[in-house]
Structure formats: C-alpha cells, structure tokens
C-alpha cells in the first residue's frame, strides 16, 4: 500500500478546529467576554467614586492633656483622573490651583492619579495647665491651622504622594479658642498660659512619600495579611525630616489600599485602589482587621519645638530622632470605614519627662 501523505498533526488540528466551533466552546467564550466586560465596567464605575475622610487625634484617649494634645483634619480625595489640570472630574477651582503646582504633578504616564484637598488644625501645649508664666523647660504653646493640596500617583503595589501644606502658626491658628471651646464643652479646666504661645508666622511644608505593598491572600472575604513600607522626606519652616517605616495588617477583607491614614503630612493612603476593595462591591460587604505600624524620623526642624523662624520665641532642645509605634483596629461596612489607632511616641525634646501617647480616630466614606 502507498504510504499516507497526511500530516501526523492533521488529526489534532481537525480536533482543535471542531472544538473551537462547538456550541459548548462558544458558550464559554461568550460568558468569558461578558465577565471581562462586567469587570471592566465595574472598574470604570469605581474610578468615579470620591472619598471623604475625617480624622480626630487627641491625648484624651491616654487620659493626658499635654504635648501634641489635639488634631483634626477633613480630607477630600478625587476619583482616579488622567491628569491634574484638564480632568472634568475636578471642580474648576481645583484645576486652577493645580496649574500653579505643576512641579508636584510628576511625569509618569498611564498611572492612576488622585487629587487631595484637606484642611486641619493641630494644638500643642506644655504639661502644667495652671502656670501663666513662660515654662522654660517645657515646650511652647502652639497652634497650626493649615490647608493642604496633594497629588497621588499609583501603580500596582506602589503609591507616590506629593503634598504641600500652607497655613499659619500662632494666635491666628485659633489653637487657644479651639481648646477652650472643647474644654468648656467637656467641663475641663482651661490652660492658662496661652499668652506665651508662638507668634504668628506663615507656615509651609512640602512632603514626598513613597509606599510599597506586599500582600498575601487579601482579595475576597478570606483571611489575609499584608505589609506596607514607606519612606519620605518633608521640607519647610514648620517641619523638615526624613522618615521611614512600615505597617502590618491581618484580618478579613483587608481593603485594597495603602494602610491606615494619619494627620501627618503624606499620611493620606486609605483611598480604595481596585474593584476588589470591600468598599467597591456594592453589596454592603464587611471587613475587619488589626494593624501595627511604626514611623522613624530624623528631624531637622520642628517649629513647635524650635520656636519661630524669624522672631525670637521660646524653644526647647529638640531630639534628632523620634519614633512612633501604633496599634489599632479597622472595620469596614459598605463604603464606610472606621479605624482607631493608639500611638506611642518617643521623647521629642530633651527636657520632656517621658514619652507621649495619644489616640487617633478616622472615619472614611467612599461614595
């Protein structure tokens, strides 16, 4: 018999061709297309969501009233945008401000971008509330009222934040009035030495911070863990420092973001990053996790310890290295997130009797 000239692969090719046109394959192919389309639509929908954050920090949680005694900040985070100047997702007044801050925009293309606008206040006091005279061996009274503009650029597992905070230190920051209001409300004794506070001075601080993330089993509702590192720097007459640190989280439905936010510059990192985040599922999904974090700073300037920049004022001997350690818990339900952290801070100046601690409460809503 003549030898067959048919290719040894012809049977396999015919089988593949028949499989590709079979009804079962077409059915699964169409289902896959629909699934991809729905995921893409969900991705587009989540990019249109805004995030509003409220932070309240106070040493009342530690039953003290001294050093960094109170802080509050309200932050508004935009949806993902293509650029900071032309995006119609941003109000006109924000785009106009952004045109003057192009240095902070960065040059990377095709990444997720967000604009952050914030307003806040921080208050610092010495330990002795009854002393009306200047206390030489304790920190100055000071208030800091500020507005911030930040720009975030996100890649998978990475976040870069550039933020500029501008405001005023001194009586114009209304630190005394804010503290007196709260103390009257709660029936606490007032601090009597506010006449010795730092003088009025315009303040600014520019911050860059880079974060990177390593995850394990954090998607869906499973138990998971992740680790988030950060490093950055701050320059300004209010603060100048180098910093580095990390956060470790473990729990159920850990949010797909870059950790637990704080009032410190560059600390805004809780914006949802993908459709897998519990706040984007649309079915009131819940999540619960605990976290431990630390931040180590090499401090070159701190107006709240070094005193006024251009005028003679009270000052203390600042420590060059300061560390924060925080432990806390965070709960998510639907688009809302509530977190509490207790922060332990090492001594900030040599005359300080002991380390300081305070509580930080954060409420975030994505809508």
Named regions from a protein language model:
Residues 43-82, 114-129, 297-305, 321:
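Short glycine/proline- and aromatic-enriched beta-strand/turn motifs that initiate or cap beta-hairpins
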Residues 57-61, 124-128, 169-173, 213-217, ...:
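Sequence/structural signature of outer-membrane beta-barrel proteins
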Residues 132-137, 191-196, 232, 311-315, ...:
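Extracellular loop and loop/strand-boundary signature of outer-membrane beta-barrel proteins
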